[in-house]
Curated annotation (Swiss-Prot):
GO terms for cellular component: HslUV protease complex; proteasome core complex. PROSITE patterns: PROTEASOME_BETA_2. GO terms for biological process: proteolysis involved in protein catabolic process. Belongs to the peptidase T1B family. HslV subfamily. It catalyses: ATP-dependent cleavage of peptide bonds with broad specificity. The gene is hslV. It is found in: Cytoplasm. This is ATP-dependent protease subunit HslV. Keywords: Allosteric enzyme, Cytoplasm, Hydrolase, Metal-binding, Protease, Sodium, Threonine protease.
Length: 178
């Protein structure tokens, strides 16, 4: 059995004055589903005004959550905290080996913080990461373009569609919205 964890699909959708992040609940080790109800979407910050979702190795992702939350507490602003974390990621050896991606969003901004220390803002308000990320991104873009569904519903449906295609993604969706 392979010791590689395949652990998620996360999608972030921004529509109108709402932003939603959704994630599936499946954690896979090799060819075995180890857990079907993992929670990969969380609220961060003093008042829970930042949503975050992770894809990648779970221990690495929790480390990044903690580091990002510390930057958020220190700098108080999402973009600044993301850039400061990315700087650390590029300069600290222990962070360079972390195998995870973060999607973070507040009322104004959505960002991906990549495993190489990049900070990327999506041009259309939709971003997806993880093993089913391409499927979820495609589904969310189609739903955004051709329906009047709200951000929460689009994010939920996009994960469901990805779960129908990607073997590392299930339909046990956790979604949160600002």
């Amino acid at each position: 059995m392979s010791n590689v964890f395949h652990a998620t699909t996360i999608v972030c959708v921004r529509r109108g004055d709402k932003v939603a992040i959704a994630g599936d609940g499946q954690v896979t080790l090799g060819h075995t589903v180890m857990k079907s109800n993992a929670r990969k979407v969380r609220r961060l910050g003093r008042d829970g005004q930042v949503l975050a979702g992770f894809a990648g190795a779970a221990a690495d992702a929790f480390t990044l959550f903690e580091l990002f939350e510390a930057k958020l507490e220190k700098h108080g602003q999402l973009s600044r905290a993301a850039v400061e974390l990315a700087k650390d990621w590029r300069t600290e050896r222990r962070l360079g080996k972390l195998e995870a991606l973060l999607v973070v969003a507040d009322k104004e901004t959505s960002l991906v913080i990549s495993g190489t220390g990049d900070v990327i803002e999506p041009e259309d308000g939709i971003v997806a990461i993880g093993s089913g990320g391409s499927y979820a991104l495609s589904a969310a873009r189609a739903l955004m373009a051709h329906t009047a569904l709200d951000a929460r519903t689009i994010a939920t449906e996009a994960i469901g569609i990805a779960g129908n295609i990607c073997i590392y993604t299930n339909r046990n969706v956790v979604v949160d919205e600002l």
